[in-house]
Amino acid sequence: GVVDILKGAAKDIAGHLASKVMN
């Protein structure tokens, strides 16, 4: 549902930010 989509997007954003910080 919509909540699952939002959770997935949040995880993707968090992953991108984390990868930028780690580099």
Curated annotation (Swiss-Prot):
Principal subcellular localisation of the protein: secreted
Subcellular locations according to the entry: Secreted
Asparagine amide modifications at: 23
UniProt entry keywords in alphabetical sequence: Amidation, Amphibian defense peptide, Antibiotic, Antimicrobial, Secreted
UniProt KW Secreted keyword: yes
GO biological process assignments: defense response to bacterium; symbiont-mediated hemolysis of host erythrocyte
InterPro entries: Antimicrobial15 (IPR012518)
Tissue distribution of the protein: Expressed by the skin glands.
Superkingdom, taxonomy of origin: Eukaryota
GO CC terms in record: extracellular region
Main function: Antibacterial peptide that inhibits the Gram-negative bacterium A.actinomycetemcomitans ATCC 29522 (MIC=210 uM). No activity against the bacteria E.coli ATCC 25922 and S.aureus ATCC 25923, or the fungi C.albicans ATCC 18804 and C.lusitaniae ATCC 56936. Does not show hemolytic activity towards rabbit erythrocytes.
Family the entry assigns: Belongs to the frog skin active peptide (FSAP) family. Ocellatin subfamily.
Protein's name in the database: Ocellatin-LB2
Taxonomic source organism: Leptodactylus labyrinthicus
